[in-house]
């Protein structure tokens, strides 16, 4: 369902064909869940935003339950945060996981066709909590990274070699070299790296240096000296008027861990402090309002209600406690529209467009 003009989708499709796998295409994002139930795939390509939607669906399902069923459901959901790749659990935790799998996780697999073994994820960083939910439900997330200029994948979590780590995009692929520049930028060499942009030597010189290293534009580290972890985009980092730098993507990912925050953009270049534009998760926010007897006529009125603003602000405050003093969000503004590729705030692969 991702655009075939996108090198990520195209290259993975080539790999599927090489392995003799059948490929099914879904033309409408709204039909994905029903198509998965019908096709019953063993794996599918995705982007983090869609997997966040899947996770939100699991949470919504639990909230529809009552009594002991609801308690068991969220006990099982919370249990997923113990998941780590290639980890041996103790006897008590193993028993809990076995019970949760029979009662809850098996239902999640069934909701996604019942056959999924792997979910390929790329295009942006996936929140670790979502990777753990999928992993505990026996749907391992193969998160990787790359660019069109690198053909595209340079690193990916590899279950065949048991080289997987949550929160990273996995080990570097064989044949590639990666190093971290002094400013934190990820540089790479390898057979898949382009020779240059077509008839654009000046543009090529901006990204390939004299030693042949391609500058990816991503900021990251090598965790344990082996697993690549991307923390932000170099061009998206901005400076406050006081001289401190802000890496917005890291803050945005933390904020989106709240079930009430659908999308967020951290801003504040050349300002005294960082602020955030927030598109709420309106279905869940509507549920919260119904539960707390908060009345409104439409979303425009909803986002202006003091109790709603306070609720979202409390979610932001929790994240602020984990940030440095200069990184903390000092002001928020709620918007009444859902951000989509059609409205222009998101790209076709559901990444945030900051220059809208």
Language model regions located:
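Conserved A3 ("GATE") glycine/threonine-rich loop of ANL adenylate-forming enzymes
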Residues: 6-8, 49, 123-130, 143-160, ...
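Adenylate-forming
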Residues: 193, 227-256, 285-306, 325-329, ...
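Conserved ATP-binding/catalytic segment of the ANL
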Residues: 171-240, 257
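Active-site loops of AMP-binding adenylate-forming
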Residues: 126, 134-140, 147-166, 200-203, ...
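Conserved C-terminal "lid"/linker of ANL adenylate-forming enzymes
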Residues: 263-267, 313-356
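Conserved ANL (AMP-binding/adenylate-forming) active-site segment centered on the GW(Y/F)…HTG consensus within
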Residues: 95, 162, 166, 193-217, ...
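C-terminal boundary motif of the adenylate-forming
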Residues: 219, 224, 258-283
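Conserved AMP-binding/adenylation subdomain of ANL enzymes
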Residues: 4-105, 115
């Amino acid at each position: 369902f991702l655009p075939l003009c996108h090198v990520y989708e195209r290259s993975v499709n080539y790999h599927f064909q090489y392995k003799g796998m059948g490929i099914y295409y879904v033309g409408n994002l709204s039909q994905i869940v029903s198509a998965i139930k019908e096709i019953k795939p063993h794996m599918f390509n995705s982007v983090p935003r869609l997997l966040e939607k899947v996770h939100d669906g699991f949470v919504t399902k639990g909230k529809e339950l009552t009594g002991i069923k609801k308690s068991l459901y969220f006990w099982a959901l919370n249990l997923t945060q113990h998941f780590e790749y290639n980890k041996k659990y103790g006897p008590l935790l193993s028993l809990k996981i076995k019970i949760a799998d029979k009662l809850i996780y098996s239902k999640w697999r069934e909701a996604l066709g019942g056959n999924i073994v792997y979910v390929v994820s790329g295009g942006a960083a996936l929140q670790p909590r979502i990777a753990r939910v999928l992993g505990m439900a026996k749907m391992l997330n193969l998160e990787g990274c790359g660019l069109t200029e690198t053909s595209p994948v340079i690193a990916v979590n590899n279950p065949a070699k048991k080289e997987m780590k949550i929160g990273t995009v996995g080990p570097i692929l064989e044949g590639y070299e990666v190093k971290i520049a002094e400013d934190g930028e990820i540089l790479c060499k390898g057979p898949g790296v382009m020779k240059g942009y077509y008839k654009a030597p000046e543009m090529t010189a901006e990204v390939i240096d004299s030693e042949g290293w391609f500058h990816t534009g991503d900021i990251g580290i090598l965790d344990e000296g082996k697993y690549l972890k991307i923390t932000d985009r170099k061009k998206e980092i901005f400076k406050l008027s006081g001289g401190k730098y802000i890496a917005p993507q890291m803050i945005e990912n933390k904020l989106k861990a709240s079930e009430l925050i659908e999308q967020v953009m951290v801003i504040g270049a050349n300002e005294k402090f960082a602020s955030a534009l927030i598109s709420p998760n309106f279905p869940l926010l509507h549920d919260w309002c119904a539960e707390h007897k908060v009345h409104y006529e439409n979303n425009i009125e909803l986002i202006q209600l003091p109790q709603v603003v306070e609720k979202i602000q409390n979610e932001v405050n929790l994240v602020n406690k984990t940030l440095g003093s200069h990184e903390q969000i000092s002001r928020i503004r709620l918007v009444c529209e859902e951000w989509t590729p059609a409205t222009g705030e998101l790209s076709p692969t559901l990444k945030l467009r900051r220059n809208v």
